[in-house]
Amino acid sequence: MREMLNNIGAYGEWAAGLVPDPPRLSYRKPGWASLNAWKAQARQRYLDALLRPESGGTPRATVQHHIEFDGLAIEHLSWQLPYGPPTEAIVLKPAGASGKLPAVLALHDHGGNKYFGTRKITRISQDVHPAMAAHQERFYGGVAWANELARRGYVVLVTDAFSFGSRRVRAGDLSDPVRRGLTEQNPEASDEIQRYNAWAEAHEHVLSKSLFCAGTTWPGVFVGEDQRALDYLCSRPDVDATRVGCGGLSGGGLRTVYLSGADPRIRCSCAAGMLTTWRDFLLNKAYTHTWMVYIPGLPRDLDYPEILGLNVPNAAMVLNNHEDQLFTVPEMERGTNMLTEIYRNAGAPERFQGKFYPGLHKFDRTMQADAFAWFDKWLRA
């Protein structure tokens, strides 16, 4: 009998069969002494698999400039991690706000565009790069969602992720065989940005393999960096560190899943356009996704949605699109059902919500309204 068509042909069902369902450390399996006992063992396994490199303590941020725009007080920050170029970040909150506010770490997407980072989900002036105006129109309903959330009474922090924006790999630092003719002579020019992004896409496997050779993983790097951003956010005098969340679309949804699984300081999360199963990646959709996703060895112990489940009973929301070209609907549904079961088994069914919307891969205004209401429910109540 011929196997169903899949990413790796005749090897597909064999490979899928290597992963037990449920996996070895799943909370969907009976026999755990307590929720806390499961979380301690499963989270430690997850953290061990990430192989996070040392990323320092709470970053010492420098304010590059402070402006007010569209009713928001905005700080443009930078800080230096123990490696790589400085990280640029944006903080937004309502102008004139006082006291400690709830806060959200807003995580930008991948989107096949490594030239940009924070600018994908923020606006700090009327002068918006045409590529970012188009990006926000395509994926976010034409708005900068970090601004929209800040306007509701939050301190919102957005940082350039590892290999994006200020943290991107630069042509001048590369050996000739890897550079492949890449230059950065007119960095804001649209044609040069397109060339950079095409180069960066082709460079992903080199970067990922190099990180493996360094004894770490791509998720381990960005989770560590997002935890340092969380350290900074929680240290701010205008932030109530007991009311902090995170969220994002696509690559930002991936970062939401992984950060929430690693760090219980995340009291509420919303992952948009990034909830499926390892089986979906393995058999159907790995070719559509970045190397940022993969954590070697972990699927035998935890399915992808169960990483987010490690943060139970803290609140979690996942938002999916029925026509999302990056996933299959049955596996999005199966992943959502896994989280429903985990939260039910933990006695906190009301703290998880999974929703589906019509349309392609996106986090549009309707989805944003639901996400913002979710943050309000758990961080502002």
Segments from the language model and where they lie:
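Proline/glycine-enriched tight loop/beta-turn segments at coil->beta junctions
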Residues: 84-87, 94-104, 110-113
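Mobile cap/lid helix-loop segments that gate and shape the active-site cleft of serine hydrolases
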Residues: 201-216, 220-229, 268-308, 313, ...
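Alpha/beta-hydrolase fold nucleophile elbow
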Residues: 238-250
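Short glycine-enriched nucleophile-adjacent loop
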Residues: 253-264
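Conserved strand-to-loop "acid loop" that flanks and positions the catalytic carboxylate
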Residues: 312-327, 358
